[in-house]
Amino acid sequence: GNLKGCKAIMRDFAPRVKAFLSLDDQSTHVCARAVGSARYRITADTRGGHSFADFGARSAIEVLSRLTCALYRQALPRAAGGVTTYNVGMISGGTSINAIAQHAEMLYEYRSNDAKSLAAMKEKLNVILRENALPDAKVTVELLGERPCGTATDPAAQKALETACCAALKHYVGGKKPISVGSTDCNIPLSLGIPSAS
């Protein structure tokens, strides 16, 4: 998970690697542009209470709902050729219908094929967390994983690798295979400037 294997390979051998080829379980395209990402677990804890007797007490679910709304109102960074996205993929919490939730958590991620946009999204997350801080709620953020996006490589070497991969795919699978973007083991070598394709 989180490209740990590829990170270890590059940590030990990057200076000796001229090009990197990853064989994934798909044959529909050649992936040669890296989409980076950051994934978080955001947890809210409050005093909670009974829905009638303690009405008005802060709910952990409400805290995360406020954060989710703020995240979905954010403006995305604009970069030439860059695409940036975000998603709250899961929210869970509470114990029963008549209990004000004491605990809730959500999973949030953002992705981009532009390194500056990834950095901007990280800063935006920190700003949103600060702006939505509440005195009667504790919010914790746990980084679950980070993947870098690709940076510029030697254009001629990268093009040669892409051409060879497309030719091999066409020979064995048929048809013209487009160059695509994605999140693969190639993220790591591409982020180090090593020509790579998957």
Question: What feature does the model see in each segment?
Answer:
Residues G1-S37:
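Acidic/histidine-rich catalytic neighborhood of metal-dependent amide-processing enzymes
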Residues D25-A32, R41-D45, G49-S198:
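Metal-dependent amide/peptide-bond hydrolase catalytic core
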